[in-house]
Amino acid sequence: VPASPPSRATLAAAVGLVALLTVVALECLRTLLSVGYFVGERIGWITGGLVVVALFAAPVLAPVLRRLVGSTAALPVAVAVLVVGRLALQATRPVPFWLAMAAAGLSFAAVTLGIAALRSAWDDGSVTAMVAVGAGVALDLVVRTTGATWDVAWRQDPAAWLLSIGLLAGLVAATVLVHRGDIAPADEDHGGPLVAFLLWPYLYLLVVTTQSPAFLDAAAGVPLAAGTALAAVNAVVGLLVLVAMSRIGLPRAGRALGGLAVSACAFVLPLATGAGAVVLALAAQVAASALLGAASGAERGERHTGIVRTGLASAGGAVLFAAGVLVYVLHTIQPLPVTNRVVPAVLGLLLALSVIARPVPDRRREVITTTPLVAWVAAGVAVIGFVSAAALAATAPGTPSATLTPAADGSRALRVMSFNIDQGVTEGQLDLEQIAEQIEEADPDVVVVEEVARGWSLSGMTDEAEWLGRRLGMATVWSPAADAQFGNVVLSRLPISDARVVDLGKTAGTQARSFAVATLDVGDGQPVTVLGGHLQNGDDPAIHDERAASYRTILDAWGGRPRTILLGDLNTYPREVPPGWPELNLPLDAGLRTTQDVDRCTAPTSNQNCPDWIFTSADLPVAPVEIVVDRPDHRPIAATVTIPPSG
């Protein structure tokens, strides 16, 4: 006999509970990845990666917690401890690895318990649980727009604390309502374990690509506001398609085509740009939502599945999620034998094969309770998503109008800076505000920032280029490296009259690097050209050859023009540093000059880590290079360049 649905109030509370649990889980996940990045650098990428992947098996704790505290108390206890852990994440600096792991693991178990509660309530619970998770991903998108994609868990401003407290208070309130309502905390839930497993590959696609504003704006080459609007569109479409396919089902041929579409889109999407990236993201969202909807609908009315099987299935999917995220990014550090794009493609294929194997329902599914629910959820997602996008558009910095004030002799002082921020992660802490303050301390007119992430998982899937541009009120020129989501940005408080990107290609390294060329208007009627970027690191002969080839390409782009500055993390050491760095002669022989020691790592870059350089054309006098702030890895360098009177 089908289970009767709970009251509307309890249903709304349960959906809100799972949605808010999803938001908190995603925040804890991103925090863990940033902290784990630092730990991986210390204990080894393979070891650190295995530790993080193992943690994602935490959903198996759901049945353990039920056994320890009882079915009725398990979810409230998990939520209470999670609230404390989430507040501790934001209050503790630096965030210790154990705390990040504990909060993330508990959040995964709590999500599993919340989904099990929804699935235990009535026959349509499996579909409703997927709608609730989808709503949570969309709500997470909106929450992150308040910090231009920088997570509130890392922020210390009053608005971030108020938002965190509000979200957690809502989570507690929803838990109380569900606990008092007519959703019985059964030890079994309706449907098989398949959807609990498939949820995680589906989440991978949403969180990393189709509903990631940073991924979408970087790939499409549009502002963050537009990327947020695109993510909101994908969220609404995904919810509608999921519920529609849960009602009407998909024949095996349709599932096969959908699976092929998901896998193909997932393989191509990481390198897609422009309008093609937008179309592929929407296609991947539609195909994946159709497959998950068909699987959820097929589970309606199935025999009950114990919480143990649900926990194990969820743990298996979560481990695949973690493996996919880490293997994809770590390919740039320790290359795989094949392209890392096979990772999302394999996850998409796994999603497809699992659904194709399901029996086709004998009749159309009547999902009476879920249909009005998803209408309200989709409408809410659309409204808050587009309002958030409009708010981002309204607060975007305008075109810079600053000029350099001439001295008595007509010359102008141009302050330049190079800063490798290592994805914004300093000793495990994603503190973008600290980086912005360090840039402000140097007071540059133009700064080249290397190792900038725009949607990469290890930096919390933040759009760091957009965030820095907004925070500092500077214009940006983006140049990709590993993909459209990782590279370098030129920030300028002066007007940029022209900008282009020079492709450096890919040879011995894992990244297809590029160099930005920005033409600045300094106010004297004559342009100043800035070339900035990041070259491949390493001292193998093949890497030396690659850097030399990159220098030649950059120098060709320069073409000997006057009033030119070349700077960045060039990963080139002084010539006498073993094993010898002859490629440094290329810019020097071409006529560029520097005040840095070209033979040894001497002051100011004297910590035996001096790969960062500032060169100028012969007509631009430059003051000695300075270290702006002492950091554990790359120390930002700055110098004042004198622009002689024009004419």
Task: Label the predicted regions.
Residues R454-A475:
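Cys-nucleophile CN-hydrolase/nitrilase-fold catalytic domain and related Cys-dependent amidase chemistry
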Residues I439-V452:
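Proline-aspartate-enriched helix->loop->beta-strand connector
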Residues P2-A442, R470, A475-V477, D483-G647:
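Active-site regions of metal-assisted phosphoester/phosphodiester hydrolases
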Residues V452-G455, C601-T602:
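Short active-site-proximal "capping" loops at secondary-structure junctions
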